[in-house]
């Protein structure tokens, strides 16, 4: 596998992000992607919970964009006409009308459950990405750890935790083994589809969370 060069979303951003998100869900005064003045600047209002979620998701999206750029630069997967076939073999989370996240039929509680459940389902795919970027593994790790922190924070906002579905560890382990056993072309295509789908899911989540 060709290695991927490290972009601006690299070691420094990763190290800072990892230190901030590991202890708990957003326990530190400064989140990844935030400047300290955004949190407690003199003579200014600190960011609200919603604003911090917004900024945190955009931080993750920046990381995804960097990884997608590297993926597209090293292969033609972003332009492949065969991606629909590969996508049929994946079960990537998507937003639907019944999830209550769209403007029409918006339901805050139902939508929040969908967002959290979807993020939990994406975790196995983010784990798969950890072995796909030799030189940019820190970027993939930062996206993964920042997503874990986002899940923890959103779970604290949810009113109906019992409605949140958590994937079975054995199912995830089996899926991960299956993905890693694919041939090189399918692994490259899977990487592209995961990044694209996760970006779309986060963008939809961000729009919905701004209504909450």
From Swiss-Prot:
PROSITE patterns: INTERLEUKIN_6. Glycans are attached at residues 73, 172. One of its GO terms (cellular component) is interleukin-6 receptor complex. Residues 1-27 form the signal peptide. The keyword Zinc does not apply. One of its GO terms (biological process) is vascular endothelial growth factor production. It is found in: Secreted. It comes from the Eukaryota. The modification Phosphoserine is found at residue 81. Keywords: Acute phase, Cytokine, Disulfide bond, Glycoprotein, Growth factor, Phosphoprotein, Secreted, Signal. Pfam families: IL6. Cytokine with a wide variety of biological functions in immunity, tissue regeneration, and metabolism. Binds to IL6R, then the complex associates to the signaling subunit IL6ST/gp130 to trigger the intracellular IL6-signaling pathway. The interaction with the membrane-bound IL6R and IL6ST stimulates 'classic signaling', whereas the binding of IL6 and soluble IL6R to IL6ST stimulates 'trans-signaling'. Alternatively, 'cluster signaling' occurs when membrane-bound IL6:IL6R complexes on transmitter cells activate IL6ST receptors on neighboring receiver cells. IL6 is a potent inducer of the acute phase response. Rapid production of IL6 contributes to host defense during infection and tissue injury, but excessive IL6 synthesis is involved in disease pathology. In the innate immune response, is synthesized by myeloid cells, such as macrophages and dendritic cells, upon recognition of pathogens through toll-like receptors (TLRs) at the site of infection or tissue injury. In the adaptive immune response, is required for the differentiation of B cells into immunoglobulin-secreting cells. Belongs to the IL-6 superfamily. Component of a hexamer of two molecules each of IL6, IL6R and IL6ST; first binds to IL6R to associate with the signaling subunit IL6ST. Interacts with IL6R (via the N-terminal ectodomain); this interaction may be affected by IL6R-binding with SORL1, hence decreasing IL6 cis signaling. Interacts with SORL1 (via the N-terminal ectodomain); this interaction leads to IL6 internalization and lysosomal degradation. May form a trimeric complex with the soluble SORL1 ectodomain and soluble IL6R receptor; this interaction might stabilize circulating IL6, hence promoting IL6 trans signaling. This is Interleukin-6. It comes from Macaca thibetana.
């Amino acid at each position: 596998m060709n290695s991927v060069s490290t972009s601006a979303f690299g070691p420094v951003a990763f190290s800072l992000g990892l230190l901030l998100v590991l202890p708990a869900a957003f326990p530190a005064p400064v989140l990844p992607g935030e400047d300290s003045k955004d949190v407690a600047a003199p003579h200014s209002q600190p960011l609200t919970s919603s604003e911090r979620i917004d900024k945190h998701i955009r931080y993750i999206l920046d990381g995804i964009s960097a990884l997608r750029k590297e993926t597209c630069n090293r292969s033609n997967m972003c332009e492949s006409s065969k991606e629909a076939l590969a996508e049929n073999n994946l079960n990537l989370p998507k937003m639907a009308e019944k999830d209550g996240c769209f403007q029409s039929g918006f339901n805050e509680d139902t939508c929040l459950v969908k967002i959290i459940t979807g993020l939990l389902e994406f975790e196995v795919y983010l784990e798969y990405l950890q072995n796909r970027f030799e030189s940019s593994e820190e970027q993939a790790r930062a996206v993964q750890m920042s997503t874990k922190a986002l899940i923890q924070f959103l779970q604290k906002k949810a009113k109906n935790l019992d409605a949140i579905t958590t994937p079975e560890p054995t199912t995830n382990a089996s899926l991960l083994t299956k993905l890693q056993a694919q041939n090189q072309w399918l692994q490259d295509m899977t990487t592209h589809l995961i990044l694209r789908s996760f970006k779309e899911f986060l963008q939809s989540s961000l729009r919905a969370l701004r209504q909450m």
